[in-house]
Amino acid sequence: MAKKNASLLVKLVSTATKTTKTGEEKLTGYFCVKKRNPKNLPKKLEFRKYDPVVRRHVLFKEEKLK
């Protein structure tokens, strides 16, 4: 039998905020999905990636994939 893959799918969510017409700030809601092996990377992932909603490179933080 083949070994079970140890990689987990995690969701990286943009931390950028966007101001709405009413003046309140909300997250852009943009995210991407990556694989992470918890044996090799025990800490949560953080990347600076491009967010097309705000058209800038911003910090993306790991969240659980639902």
UniProtKB/Swiss-Prot annotation:
GO terms for molecular function: structural constituent of ribosome. Signal peptide: none annotated. Keywords: Ribonucleoprotein, Ribosomal protein. One of its GO terms (cellular component) is cytoplasm. GO terms for biological process: translation. InterPro entries: Ribosomal_bL33, Ribosomal_bL33_sf, Ribosomal_zn-bd. Belongs to the bacterial ribosomal protein bL33 family. This is Large ribosomal subunit protein bL33. It comes from Wolbachia pipientis subsp. Culex pipiens (strain wPip). The lineage of its organism: Bacteria, Pseudomonadati, Pseudomonadota, Alphaproteobacteria, Rickettsiales. The gene is rpmG.
